[in-house]
Amino acid sequence: VHIGRSENGKPIKITAAKSLNFANIAKECFERKGIDVVGIIDCASPYVIEDIENFLKTGEAYEIEDGGIIYKDKICIILGSEVETTETREDGKHGCAHNLCYFPSLKDIKGFSNEMSKHIHNITLSTQKSDISGYELIDIVEKYNGVLIPAHIFTPFKSYYGNCTERLSRIFKEKYDKIFAVELGLSADTYIADEISELANKNFITNSDAHSLPKIAREYNKLLVDKISFKEIMKAIKMENGRKILANY
């Protein structure tokens, strides 16, 4: 889920609704959507980081040891950042791809934000173009205990298969085994992805990519976990210890 504006009205995702801020997303999930977990993908913006710090001070939300922010003892919020990387295509030209980067704690995403400000011209805005590749980005994500998931991988212009490469493994090379899952996006489904041999041992997730409150949970995942936390959700995405993705909707 994207953030349109900070609590004090600063723009984050220009194309997203102004009502789409951190607190409103949490409330929408709790009051209307009936979901247990939401990933908010613009949390590396310093404006959003400030909103999260203030949100935690309200007493309605708290961080947990296994990662994530629990809101009203029910909703687990996973902090994330969507980063646009610059890739070299097979023909030598350059393409751009989006990457979902998820982190267990506010401290981790603050560290990630500080480091990425060296590679992104305006870190306050959503999904800005960086001067690094996915191959380089995954090391920075792991430095701050995060997980990288290639975003909407078939979408034209801003994805790996849509704009950068015929093989994802060509981009990540020896680090390809660190990619546990890919996001399908609105332009594809599991039947299409299953036709690509290099994705045979990767798991698929579907997210709403919501740009407004009503669009939250337009697409979603059903997971089998022991409890709700960043650690458990990542186990499900990796299919570890009996945790797993049950379905994409």
Where do the protein language model's features map onto the residues?
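Histidine-centered catalytic micro-motifs
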Residues: 1-5, 43, 206-211
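Acidic/histidine-rich helix-loop elements
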Residues: 2-19
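Extended substrate/RNA-proximal surfaces in nucleic-acid metabolism proteins
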Residues: 7, 47-180
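Divalent metal-dependent hydrolysis catalytic cores, especially in the metallo-beta-lactamase
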Residues: 26-48, 147-149
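Short, charged, surface-exposed secondary-structure boundary motifs
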Residues: 89, 110-112, 214-218, 232-238
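Acidic/histidine-rich catalytic cores of soluble enzymes
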Residues: 182-191
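Short acidic/histidine-rich active-site segments
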Residues: 202-218
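Flexible inter-domain linker/hinge segments
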Residues: 225-249
